[in-house]
A protein has these predicted regions:
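Phosphate/oxyanion-binding active-site loops and adjacent basic polyanion-contact surfaces
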Residues: 107-122, 147-151, 178-186, 214, ...
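Conserved SAM-binding motif I beta-strand of class I
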Residues: 170-178
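Conserved class I S-adenosyl-L-methionine
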Residues: 133-149
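A structural alpha-helix within SAM-dependent methyltransferase catalytic domains
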Residues: 119, 155-159, 253-258
Length: 329
């Protein structure tokens, strides 16, 4: 077991020559960072914890809010990536006190479970398509994707399942985001993973960064048209469906629908509605000021009535996250 935990970790350079691990959900240290029973118990206890926190003196509550690292009412892509790495993979990175504290918290384990489970859903969808259509290229559109660990790790899972499926075809990861730090790091990760001896060596993988505001989704129309013969997957983990308005979600879905192929898929994550979400999670996000949407499955279904997409499958994580895939009606 110790030998497995010591498996080599590839690194990519972030800003200011800082080296960060490339997140690989198949690495033993990532797997060891998930204890689903401990996470479940943490979710059960969180409601009582937040009530106790509310009773604390104001200056202590302010310290706690600052420690949560929320900027502009959301958790940024690179900080989210840090918490997805977990305490073991992030060991050795020079962190401030707040990040050292946060990365060890059981509550952030949910981000790792969410990433892992979404990658499993996406790889299952794509494995079937890649087997059926060996001549077609593969294209990801990752809305608010930041460092795109879900797209990269979906490819890792496909390669581990059947490495021949990725050979001989063009593969694109298109990150559509207003952020530049996350996509830049994702590009450096792909560059490292394509080097000799690394996972993606010999594969034709391109990562494109597209400045994208989801309130103006016109870019999806042209991009999907230019790749009309490709296998296409549009995803948004912790992005559009957790922060976007109804109209933003509808417009993005409809724009992607117009020129994408008949077997295109949409995947993503959303939060349970207020009536059913874990009360501790609800209390915590409101306490620290995260402007998240409690869309819920019924909310998603309501939105889908204004599109030509239908729910294909969904997966729940501890009355907090719902992962889903959509197909064309």
């Amino acid at each position: 077991m110790k030998a497995n935990l010591d498996q080599r970790i590839p690194y990519a350079v972030f800003e200011n020559e800082i080296q960060l691990p490339i997140l690989d959900i198949t690495h033993p240290l990532f797997k060891a960072s998930i204890d689903e029973q401990a996470y479940h118990l943490s979710c059960l206890k969180s409601a009582r914890s937040i009530e106790s926190l509310k009773k604390m003196p104001g200056f202590i509550r302010n310290i706690f809010v600052k420690m949560s690292n929320v900027d502009n009412s959301y958790l940024g892509g690179m900080r989210t990536l840090l918490y997805k790495l977990g305490p073991d993979l992030s060991r050795g990175i020079k962190l401030g006190f707040r990040d050292k504290w946060a990365v060890k918290q059981t509550s952030f384990m949910g981000l790792r479970i969410r990433l892992r489970d979404l990658c499993r859903i996406q790889s299952k969808i794509l494995l079937a398509q890649l087997k059926d259509f060996p001549e077609r290229n593969l294209c990801f559109y990752n809305i608010a994707g930041g460092p795109a660990p879900d797209s990269i790790n979906t490819l890792i899972l496909i390669q581990e399942s059947d490495p021949e499926l990725l050979k001989g075809r063009k593969i694109e990861i298109n990150i559509l985001d207003i952020d530049t730090y996350g996509p830049n790091f994702a590009k450096r990760c792909i560059d490292v993973l394509k080097q000799p001896g690394e996972r993606f060596h010999g594969l034709d993988i391109t990562l494109n960064m597209i400045h994208y505001d989801w309130s103006g989704p016109e870019a999806l129309l042209q991009m999907s048209l230019e790749r009309s013969g490709w296998i296409q997957l549009c995803s948004s983990e912790g992005g559009l469906f957790e922060y976007g308005s109804d109209s933003d979600i509808i417009e993005n879905l409809n724009h992607f629908y117009t020129n994408s192929p008949a077997d295109a898929r949409v995947t993503g994550s959303l939060i349970f509605d207020r009536a059913h979400v874990n009360p501790g999670y609800l209390g915590f996000t409101e306490f620290i000021g995260v402007q998240i949407r409690y869309l819920g499955l019924e909310g998603l279904q309501r939105i889908l009535t204004q599109t030509s997409w239908v729910l294909e499958e969904f997966h729940e994580i501890d009355t907090i996250y719902i992962l889903f895939s959509l197909k064309k009606a």
